[in-house]
């Protein structure tokens, strides 16, 4: 970009009319080809990413405020602001905007001329400045008409604003206000209301500075009490002077700071209460008012932060035991508002702010406050604590770990937070929900630091499970001593659901800490007691906790579940749910389906051996029958280890062979199968209801006969090879008719690639939902020495000879190798 970069903060106005911080970067201006014009560009100082790319349109109204702000509306209901670190940078960018728009840089607002016709624009530009009627009681109606007629035209709004500024007109209007009130001239007061409301819509910073000055503020509010659309006068001034009392919880020595606090409170009151709810059009015209409040708050926080005497005194009073409860409540409320204002700061300033609070001892002070009986004070302290956790959870963790070395568990800050969560008296548990979120942030390993000399995750989690976890689980353990929850009202169920949500998070993100705690304290058994709660959401929370544990596929957890028969409450809940098709039904089926699909053998065996009779009649899903099938296949492999070994050997040997050999063999299988099967004969997969090895016998038997013929041909080839000097393999396979049937049955379980019984196919023992039967007899292998076992090799005792023979076999042509995988 051509221009010098300047450091800025980018803000956007959200739907709640609050400014959102979009990041800090450097602004420049330059021609952007894609936008076909000069544009403002802001690149983030952290990574150089583009924070803002905004074309400088000739019909967009830009405003310069408070020397370091430029504000404009990018589109309807989308306002932007650039807050400059230096005035020089703001002036430079402002000049660039005015240069593009052809405006005078000495004027603090450029105008949008889009609503005016060319003729009107020429008339307005050629006419002299706007001349206001003289400020007299009899001409109030005329003044109101001039203001109202100027609002639609940007140029007329500008001229009206200049006239009001230059002639001291505002103060003369406020003098008329006093006259009208003294005379009880209601009509004149109604006209003044319209005039003052119109001046607000001029959206002019210079006018606001006059209106919100100490001399004029209350009179401006007085004018806005006489809304002609309301039958009676509003009492805003009475509220601000008599009801809303300003209390200095700590004396403020700086008069400028005190005046700024008064001003900000009253302007906020005008925006929120006094002014009528603006229309969409008027809302865009009040953007300067929002900005005025926002940047006032930033200034207040900065001034307070720099006053070390004030902050020192504040924290001294907070932690002093002699401070009475009422005074402490005022101090806490002030500190809460102070922290809320800090959210308007730029990140680097916010870092300095919270670092200052930390150095002043805000966490020990919060510990004292949380121990008080007043619920309002505790609520304010919780809000302050949430600001700290969101800003820097590591700072809070470090404090509580240091504190544990000096104090008992009962008075640890984090345990106080847990106790407040448990003891929340709100029927909706609003405070408990907030505190659960804070605890979750604190125990989340994702935001924990790991350095070369220490690991925050290990240290803090060790501390938490030793000193705090028993406090968190106390309500759960107390409520689950019997087979049903001892307390099952709605509020208790809500609290237990929050605790389970946090424990589920721990299962997912922590490792041995939570595992040891669950197994040692038998937590899962206690949690599953809640499956019998009358509140279905609590039962689902308990099931979700177990599902998270099962999903880890950890054998430590699985052995614990099996040993303690922890599927029993789940099965009971499933049966008690009956035929109702609801979330509980689906969630329970899903956990069993997960066990089947993932083939978790220990849990599969446990469920089938203990609960099959109760579940075998469930026909509307195949989940339980699939589990039974898995179990039968496991038992079959256990009862016939030779078969399992053969399957493994054949499969491993097959995987060692060249890919071209596999492709040739597969092609041979499919071609042969296609030729010999009768035309129109349907192919029945083993996953269908009617599936057994006899259905597949005929085509496979035919294939085996062809295989015998091919192998006899291979034998002749091998003999010829020997004659040419190539050494033949030490053995090769041949099949006798007596063993053909048995081997065919074996092949249906673990034989040929692409066949109905091959590994990985729907009919294999390793795949779900299949049934395969094999005879206990193993296929015979005939060698030169006669019949030997399937895995026996000649000269088995001579290991070196075996290796030599294997090497020789590997050197054979692909077509001459013994087909162990076929």
From Swiss-Prot:
Classification via Gene3D superfamilies: Leucine-rich Repeat Variant, Pleckstrin-homology domain (PH domain)/Phosphotyrosine-binding domain (PTB)
Biased composition (Low complexity): 761-774
Classification via InterPro entries: ARM-like, ARM-type_fold, EVH1_PP4R3, P4R3-like_central_dom, PH-like_dom_sf, PP4R3-like
Pfam entry (one): PP4R3
GO terms assigned for molecular function: protein phosphatase activator activity
Gene Ontology cellular-component terms listed: nucleoplasm; protein phosphatase 4 complex
Stretches the record annotates as Disordered: 744-822
Amino acid composition bias (Acidic residues), ranges on this chain: 793-808
A GO biological-process term: regulation of double-strand break repair
Record-linked SUPFAM superfamilies: ARM repeat (SSF48371), PH domain-like (SSF50729)
Domain WH1, residue spans: 1-100
Assembly: Serine/threonine-protein phosphatase 4 (PP4) occurs in different assemblies of the catalytic and one or more regulatory subunits.
PANTHER family in UniProt: ATP SYNTHASE GAMMA-RELATED (PTHR23318), SERINE_THREONINE-PROTEIN PHOSPHATASE 4 REGULATORY SUBUNIT 3A (PTHR23318:SF3)
Task of the protein: Regulatory subunit of serine/threonine-protein phosphatase 4.
Family: Belongs to the SMEK family.
Name of the protein in its database record: Serine/threonine-protein phosphatase 4 regulatory subunit 3
């Amino acid at each position: 970009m051509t221009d010098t970069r300047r450091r800025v903060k980018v803000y956007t106005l959200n739907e709640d009319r609050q400014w959102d911080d979009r990041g800090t970067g450097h602004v420049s201006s330059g021609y952007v080809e894609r936008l076909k014009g000069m544009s403002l560009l802001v690149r983030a100082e952290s990574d150089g990413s583009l924070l803002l790319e905004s074309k400088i349109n000739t019909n967009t109204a830009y405003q310069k405020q408070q020397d370091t702000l430029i504000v404009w509306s990018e589109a309807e209901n989308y306002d932007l602001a650039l807050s400059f670190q230096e005035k020089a940078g703001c002036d430079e960018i402002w000049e660039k905007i005015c240069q593009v728009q052809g405006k005078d840089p000495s004027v603090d607002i450029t105008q949008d001329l889009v609503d005016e016709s060319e003729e009107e624009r020429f008339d307005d530009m050629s006419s002299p400045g706007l001349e206001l009627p003289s400020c007299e009681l009899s001409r109030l109606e005329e003044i109101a008409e001039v203001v109202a007629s100027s609002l639609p035209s940007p140029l007329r709004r500008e001229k009206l604003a200049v006239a009001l500024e230059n002639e001291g007109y505002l103060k003369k209007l406020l003098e008329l206000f006093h006259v009208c009130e003294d005379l009880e001239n209601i009509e004149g007061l109604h006209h003044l209301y319209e005039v003052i409301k119109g001046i607000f819509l001029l959206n002019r910073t210079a006018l606001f500075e006059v209106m919100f000055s100490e001399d004029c503020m209350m009179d401006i509010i007085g004018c806005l009490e006489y809304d002609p659309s309301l039958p009676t006068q509003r009492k805003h001034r009475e509220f601000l002077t008599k009801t809303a009392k300003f209390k200095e919880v700590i004396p403020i020595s700086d008069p400028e700071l005190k005046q700024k606090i008064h001003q900000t409170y009253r302007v906020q009151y005008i925006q929120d209460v006094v002014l009528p709810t603006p229309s969409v059009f008027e809302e865009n015209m009040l953007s300067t008012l929002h900005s005025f409040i926002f940047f006032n708050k930033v200034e207040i926080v900065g001034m307070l932060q720099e006053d070390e005497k004030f902050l020192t005194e504040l924290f001294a009073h907070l932690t002093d035991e002699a401070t009475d409860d009422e005074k402490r409540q005022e101090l806490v409320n002030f500190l809460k508002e102070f922290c809320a204002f800090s959210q308007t700061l730029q990140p680097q300033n916010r870092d300095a702010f919270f670092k200052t609070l930390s150095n002043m001892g805000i966490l020990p002070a919060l510990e004292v406050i949380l121990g008080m009986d007043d619920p309002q004070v505790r609520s304010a302290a919780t809000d302050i604590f949430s600001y700290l956790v969101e800003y820097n959870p590591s700072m809070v963790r470090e404090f509580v770990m240091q504190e544990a070395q000096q104090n008992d568990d009962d008075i640890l800050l984090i345990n106080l937070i847990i106790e407040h969560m448990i003891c929340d008296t709100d029927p909706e548990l609003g405070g408990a929900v907030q505190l659960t979120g804070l605890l979750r942030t604190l125990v989340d390993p994702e935001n924990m630091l790991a350095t070369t000399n220490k690991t925050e995750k290990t240290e803090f989690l060790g501390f938490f499970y030793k000193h705090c976890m028993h406090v968190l689980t106390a309500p759960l353990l107390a409520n689950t001593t019997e087979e049903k929850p001892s307390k099952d009202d709605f509020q208790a169920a809500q609290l237990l659901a929050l605790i389970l949500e946090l424990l589920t998070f721990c299962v997912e993100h922590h490792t041995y800490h939570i595992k040891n705690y669950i197994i040692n304290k038998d937590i899962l058994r206690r949690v599953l007691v809640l499956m019998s709660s009358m509140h279905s959401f609590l039962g689902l929370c308990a099931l979700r906790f177990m599902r998270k544990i099962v999903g880890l596929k950890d054998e430590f957890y699985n052995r614990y579940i099996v040993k303690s028969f922890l599927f029993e409450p789940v099965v009971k809940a499933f049966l008690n749910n009956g035929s109702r098709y609801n979330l509980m039904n689906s969630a329970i089926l899903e956990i069993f389906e997960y066990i089947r699909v993932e083939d978790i053998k220990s849990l599969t065996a446990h469920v089938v051996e203990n609960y099959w009779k109760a579940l075998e009649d469930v026909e509307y899903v195949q989940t339980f029958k699939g589990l039974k099938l898995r179990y039968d296949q496991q038992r079959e492999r256990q009862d016939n280890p030779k078969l399992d070994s053969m399957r493994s050997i054949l499969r491993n040997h097959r995987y060692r062979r060249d890919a071209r050999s596999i492709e040739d063999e597969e092609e041979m299988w499919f071609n042969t199968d296609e030729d010999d099967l009768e035309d129109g004969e349907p192919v029945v997969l083993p996953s269908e209801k009617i599936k057994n090895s006899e259905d597949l016998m005929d085509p496979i038997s035919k294939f085996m006969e062809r295989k015998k013929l091919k192998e006899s041909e291979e034998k002749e080839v091998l003999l010829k090879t020997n004659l040419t000097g190539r050494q033949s393999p030490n053995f090769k396979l041949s099949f006798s008719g007596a063993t053909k049937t048995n081997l065919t049955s074996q092949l249906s379980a673990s034989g040929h690639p692409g066949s109905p019984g091959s590994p990985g196919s729907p009919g294999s023992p390793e795949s779900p939902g299949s049934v395969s039967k094999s005879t206990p007899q193993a296929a015979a292998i005939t060698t030169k020495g006669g019949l030997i076992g399937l895995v026996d090799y000649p000269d088995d005792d001579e290991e070196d000879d075996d290796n030599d023979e294997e090497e020789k076999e590997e050197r054979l042509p692909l077509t001459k190798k013994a087909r162990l995988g076929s």
